[in-house]
């Protein structure tokens, strides 16, 4: 088992050394899923560090920013414990045109945002997906926890245009996901189920000290359990964290 601990500074330094790698020339799709701690800007850096593999697994899928920008693997697995996120992805797969039409018809409005954010999400999977994505794209802080967030607004960038552009990008995003297995599992079960000598795991867990921004109720003990599990796997793993005394330990 090979376990790489990567922080932002190390990733950037290593990326400069590996820019000649062929995989860096792959032009992927930018995920429209806004996500706290997402790796949109570090995706190419992380991709450049990946070893050759047959099965690619993201136990903490989140916004899928690395998955969608990398060259497809023979087997790909996206997993997340967030039921609303997974419901949106599955709805996008099964009802793409209807979902996009519903989202395109919505206006960027503080009134709509405040009304929907104060209400429970609908029980119907389709309506739930529509509202969830609208709130995610208009939320100031794109967290998936119970923490409240204000409405995105500003004078430099049009939030309305940004939202509509994201809906357009969902079409290519859905096409990229067609070859991906989408799971709703605890990260431990996901790792154990897909572990093999040909598997590469991208491990992007909740950050230490920022656990409240994510679902799952992570604690210091959870981080330790993840480290213990990764020491036992047959495959390879790349772990992303910010520097912290607990992680250094």
What are the residue ranges of the model-derived segments?
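SAM-dependent nucleic-acid methyltransferase catalytic core
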Residues: 2-41, 49, 93-202, 206-213, ...
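SAM cofactor-binding core of SAM-dependent methyltransferases
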Residues: 48-119
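A cross-domain feature marking catalytic cores of carbohydrate-active enzymes
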Residues: 60, 205, 241
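Short amphipathic alpha-helical segments
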Residues: 70-72, 90, 195-196, 214-215, ...
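Charged helix-capping and loop-helix junction motifs
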Residues: 218-224
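Conserved beta-strand signature within the Rossmann-like core of class I S-adenosyl-L-methionine
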Residues: 235-240
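Binuclear metal-ion centers of metallo-dependent hydrolases, dominated by the metallo-beta-lactamase
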Residues: 242-249
């Amino acid at each position: 088992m090979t376990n790489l601990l990567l922080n932002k500074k190390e990733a950037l330094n290593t990326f400069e050394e590996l820019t000649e790698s062929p995989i860096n020339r792959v032009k992927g799709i930018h995920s429209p899923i806004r996500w706290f701690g997402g790796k949109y800007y570090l995706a190419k850096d992380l991709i450049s560090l990946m070893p050759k593999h047959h099965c690619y697994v993201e136990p903490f899928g989140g916004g899928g920013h690395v998955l969608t920008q990398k060259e497809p693997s023979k087997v790909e697995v996206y997993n997340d414990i967030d039921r609303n996120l997974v419901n949106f992805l599955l709805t996008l797969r099964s009802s793409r045109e209807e979902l996009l039409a519903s989202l395109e018809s919505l206006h960027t409005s503080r009134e709509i945002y405040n009304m929907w954010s104060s209400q429970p999400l609908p029980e119907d999977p389709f309506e739930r997906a529509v509202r969830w994505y609208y709130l995610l794209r208009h939320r100031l802080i794109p967290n998936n926890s119970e923490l409240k967030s204000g409405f995105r607004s500003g004078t430099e960038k049009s939030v309305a245009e940004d939202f509509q552009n994201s809906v357009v990008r969902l079409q290519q995003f859905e096409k990229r996901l067609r070859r991906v297995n989408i799971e709703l599992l605890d990260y431990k079960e996901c790792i154990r189920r897909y572990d093999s000598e040909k598997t590469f795991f991208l491990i992007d867990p909740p950050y230490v000290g920022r656990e409240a921004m994510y679902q799952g109720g992570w604690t210091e003990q959870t981080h330790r359990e993840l480290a213990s599990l990764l020491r036992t796997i047959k495959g390879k793993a790349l772990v992303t964290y910010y520097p912290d005394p607990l992680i250094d330990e």
